[in-house]
């Protein structure tokens, strides 16, 4: 390899081959140490960044957990405040009820006292009546005596009648007072009954409100417990995530350490391989000097036969790999079919989501009540749960299939690795054997040449001797001819064997080329399979992420749905209670209206009856009074007639007079008869008056009921309790309407949010499909670019090798160890071209993506640079004089073209433009580091070759 490079450079054999001196070796060792330190530091930086990321995630989770706990604490505080509020309300209600009970007890005591006083008054009046009756119930003798005295003194009798009439009036007044007191007692009893019914209804309402409060309290506690359980689950998940993040960081750290160890081992292996190559060269040089070439030729022929057998076996292995490749292709086709099926399922799921969105739009457009919307939401939620379950089942099936396929792919990879290892081993052995064969052939040819030369020299010397002696021996001549013929036969046989070996060698080379082509094909197919596997992994990751998002949104929707259900249940209970109250009030109103109508009809009928009865009673009273007057007139007439008769019936003088007692008795009998008739009439009059009073009382009661009923329909004053109750009910109604409107607004907002989420999900799916199509379209371009990059890398390696050799040559010529002025000029021009190409790329990116302009302006202004534009970036590909400069510029332009083309692709564009703009010094250092890395890579490739 070194000889080829020196031949390309036209190196003179008179000069020694340049070797790195001690300083360069120390510099290379220091560079290797620095690279190791750099790798270790980069691994540490990555580990610290991952730890910082894990700590940030942990801090975010802790903050979220803190917010959840604070919301729980607030909920608990609100619950305690509401419980204290209800406790104070219940205490106030208990105090009010105690006061009401005390007031009712006081009223009962006062009513009992009044009742006792009224009973005492009634008892006293009854005693007075009995006394009067006793006074009136005189015996017959006192009556006769009184009649005698009354006959004597009519004035006294008239006075007694007056007093008796007064007593009768007092008795009537007392009886009326008793009736009035009894009526008042009945009214008080009615009021007491009304108060009792009101207190019972209030107690029932209080019990009902207490039950509602208990239900709400239990529901609230259940909701808080559910919330706590969900928060506990979320905390557990956060802890698991933190643990997994820590494990991931540890695994990454171990992986980086292992990678560094592997790199060191690879470097050590490379150095050992180089040493082995040197030793092999020495061994081959020693083997060239070995004797017994014929035995070695025979051994090589045996080895060649064995190699032929191995080649046949390798051909069989290649056939097996081809069959395995065919099976893998069939598996790839089956995987493509699975992808199509999954796409069809995804399309079906999208159609199902569209159907669900149509249902949601239909639900939102239709003017449904809260209950119907809640039922629709529940149905939709159940359907969505079914779809999610079906998707989960499908995902499980797909995962199982993917796991099986990945296992099969892993097995195929293992088989492929084994086959590649066998092929590589066979190629290595084949190369070694070919090299040994070539060496032996060359050595044998050299030995044959030496032998032929020696034989020829011997023959010439013998001829000379024979000529000098003058002897010509025919036997010797024949022997020589025989030997010449034998040697020619041997030469022909050797030539035929050489031809056969050359043909077999050509066949082996053809077979090796065929195996290499097959290996390249299998490598390409392996790369395709790996890319497809990565695509499947990405698809699975995206599907898992979408599934996680759907699960999270589903959990959020479940929580919101449960909250809405609870709120709807509470509103429904309130609505039912209010509806029951309204229904009971309406029912009571209807009952009152019907009762009022019936009562008005009864009152009107009763009024008519009372009026007719009053008219009848007035007529009877008038008749009785007229009869009384007539009777009094008759009595007066009879008295006058009696006087006239007494005067007329006075016996004449001489006849004995009838005794006075006779007339007194007769008058008393008539008076008694008249008294009895008068008593009967007085009894009838009293009875009629009592009936009239009773009717008046009933009329008064009816009028009172009518006035109270009219008052109930009259406007309520602001100072009354009913007005306060009305205001409170109106406020509750307004609050309920506000809550209803707020819940409707929340439902509309939730529906809008769900619609927005569906739209974003559809847009994300469309974007994903577009990105997949773009990726598929860009795959051939990427492969082409990769090929171009490989070609450019090879060119770059060659140019860098030439550049390093020329720079060493120039430095040796100038006898300087530092960079020359020409090298600095070349580096400056390279950096300028690189900067111009980078500015051009940034300007093109800003033209394609105007959103990046603001971020780039910020970065450029921070470092005091101007924003690049396409007009301001001159052409970076000017002509150069020297061939080395043109080659470096072509490499740079190739790399810039690669970067620009990669900037056109979405992925590499984001990676390139996501970096902050670097200052010139950083660009210089990056260019130098890339140059040094390329130099080291080229040196390694030289060693390997």
Swiss-Prot record:
Residues 16-535, 584-604, 666-826 form a coiled coil. The keyword Acyltransferase does not apply. GO terms for cellular component: axoneme; extracellular region. It is found in: Cytoplasm, Cytoskeleton, Cilium axoneme. The keyword Disulfide bond does not apply. It comes from the Eukaryota. Keywords: Cell projection, Cilium, Coiled coil, Cytoplasm, Cytoskeleton. Belongs to the CCDC39 family. Required for assembly of dynein regulatory complex (DRC) and inner dynein arm (IDA) complexes, which are responsible for ciliary beat regulation, thereby playing a central role in motility in cilia and flagella. Probably acts together with ccdc40 to form a molecular ruler that determines the 96 nanometer (nm) repeat length and arrangements of components in cilia and flagella. Not required for outer dynein arm complexes assembly. This is Coiled-coil domain-containing protein 39. The gene is ccdc39.
């Amino acid at each position: 390899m070194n000889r080829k490079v020196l031949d390309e450079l036209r190196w003179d054999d008179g000069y020694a081959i340049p070797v790195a001196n001690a300083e360069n070796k120390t510099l290379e060792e220091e560079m290797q140490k620095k690279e190791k330190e750099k790798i270790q530091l980069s691994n540490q930086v990555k580990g610290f960044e991952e730890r910082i990321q894990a700590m940030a995630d942990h801090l975010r989770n802790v903050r979220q957990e803190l917010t959840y706990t604070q919301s729980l604490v607030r909920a608990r505080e609100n619950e305690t405040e509401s419980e204290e509020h209800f406790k104070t309300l219940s205490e106030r209600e208990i105090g009010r009820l105690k006061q009401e009970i005390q007031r009712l007890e006081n009223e009962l005591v006062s009513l009992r006292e009044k009742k006792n006083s009224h009973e005492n008054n009634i008892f006293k009046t009854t005693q007075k009546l009995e006394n009067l009756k006793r006074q009136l119930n005189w015996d017959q003798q006192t009556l006769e005596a009184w009649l005698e005295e009354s006959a004597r003194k009519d004035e006294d009798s008239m006075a007694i009648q007056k007093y008796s009439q007064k007593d009768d009036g007092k008795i009537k007044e007392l009886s009326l007072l008793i009736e009035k007191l009894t009526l008042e007692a009945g009214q008080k009893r009615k009021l007491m009954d009304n108060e009792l019914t009101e207190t019972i209804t209030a107690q029932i309402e209080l019990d009902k409100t207490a039950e509602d409060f208990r239900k709400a309290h239990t529901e609230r506690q259940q909701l808080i417990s559910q919330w706590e359980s969900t928060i506990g689950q979320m905390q557990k998940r956060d802890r698991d995530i933190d643990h997994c993040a820590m494990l991931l960081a540890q695994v990454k750290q171990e992986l980086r350490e292992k990678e560094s160890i592997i790199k060191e081992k690879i470097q050590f292996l490379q150095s050992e391989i180089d040493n082995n190559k040197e030793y092999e060269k020495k061994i081959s040089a020693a083997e060239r000097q070995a004797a017994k070439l014929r035995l070695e030729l025979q051994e090589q022929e045996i080895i060649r036969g064995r190699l032929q057998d191995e080649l046949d076996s390798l051909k069989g292995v290649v056939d097996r790999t081809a069959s395995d490749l065919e099976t893998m292709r069939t598996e790839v086709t089956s995987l493509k079919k699975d992808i199509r099926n999954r796409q069809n399922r995804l399309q079906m799921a999208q159609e199902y989501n569209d159907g669900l969105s149509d249902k949601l739009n239909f639900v939102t457009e239709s003017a449904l009540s809260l209950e119907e919307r809640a039922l629709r939401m529940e149905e939709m939620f159940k359907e969505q749960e079914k779809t999610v379950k079906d998707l989960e089942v499908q995902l499980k099936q797909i995962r199982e299939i993917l796991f099986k396929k990945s296992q099969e792919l892993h097995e195929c990879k293992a088989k492929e690795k084994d086959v590649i290892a066998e092929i590589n081993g066979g190629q290595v052995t084949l190369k070694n054997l070919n090299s040994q064969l070539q060496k032996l052939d060359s050595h044998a040819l050299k030995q044959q040449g030496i032998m032929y030369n020696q034989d020829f020299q011997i023959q010439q010397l013998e001829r000379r001797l024979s000529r000098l002696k003058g002897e010509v021996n025919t036997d010797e001549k024949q022997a020589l001819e025989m030997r010449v013929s034998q040697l020619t036969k041997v030469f022909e046989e050797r030539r035929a064997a050489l031809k056969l070996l050359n043909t077999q060698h050509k066949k082996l080379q053809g077979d090796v080329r065929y195996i290499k082509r097959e290996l390249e094909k299998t490598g390409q197919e392996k790369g395709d399979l790996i890319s497809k596997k990565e695509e499947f992994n990405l698809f699975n990751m995206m599907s898992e992420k979408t599934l996680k998002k759907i699960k999270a949104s589903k959990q959020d929707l479940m929580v919101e749905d449960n909250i809405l259900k609870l709120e709807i249940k509470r509103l429904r209970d309130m609505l039912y209670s209010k509806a029951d109250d309204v229904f009971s009030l309406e029912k009571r109103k209807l009952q009152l209206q019907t009762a009022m109508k019936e009562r008005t009809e009864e009152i009107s009928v009763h009024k008519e009856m009372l009026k007719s009865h009053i008219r009848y009673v007035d007529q009877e009273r008038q008749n009785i009074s007229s009869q009384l007057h007539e009777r009094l007139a008759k009595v007066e007439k009879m008295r006058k007639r009696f006087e006239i008769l007494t005067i007329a019936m006075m016996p004449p003088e001489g006849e004995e007079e009838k005794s006075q007692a006779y007339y007194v008795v007769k008058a008393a009998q008539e008076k008694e008869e008249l008294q009895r008739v008068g008593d009967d009439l007085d009894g009838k009059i009293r009875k009629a008056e009592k009936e009239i009073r009773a009717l008046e009382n009933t009329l008064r009661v009816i009028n009172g009921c009518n006035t109270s009923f009219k008052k109930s329909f009259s406007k309520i004053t602001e100072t009354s309790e009913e007005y306060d109750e009305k205001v409170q009910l109106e406020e509750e109604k307004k609050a309920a309407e506000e809550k209803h409107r707020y819940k409707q607004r929340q439902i509309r907002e939730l529906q809008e949010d769900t619609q927005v989420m569906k739209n974003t999900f559809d847009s994300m799916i469309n974007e994903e499909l577009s990105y997949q199509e773009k990726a598929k379209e860009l795959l051939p371009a990427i492969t082409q670019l990769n090929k171009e990059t490989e070609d450019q890398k090879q060119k770059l390696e060659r140019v860098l090798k030439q550049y390093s050799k020329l720079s060493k040559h120039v430095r040796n010529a100038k006898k300087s160890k530092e960079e020359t002025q020409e090298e600095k000029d070349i580096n400056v021009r390279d950096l300028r071209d690189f900067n111009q190409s980078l500015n051009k790329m940034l300007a093109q990116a800003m033209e394609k993506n105007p959103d990046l302009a603001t971020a780039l302006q910020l970065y450029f202004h921070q470092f005091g640079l101007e924003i690049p534009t396409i007009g301001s970036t001159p052409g970076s590909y000017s002509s150069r004089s020297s061939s080395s400069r043109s080659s470096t510029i072509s490499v740079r332009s190739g790399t810039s073209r690669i970067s620009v083309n990669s900037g056109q692709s979405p992925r590499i564009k984001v990676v390139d433009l996501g970096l902050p703009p670097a200052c010139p010094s950083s660009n210089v250092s990056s260019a130098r580091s890339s140059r040094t890395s390329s130099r080291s890579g080229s040196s390694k490739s030289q060693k390997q070759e």
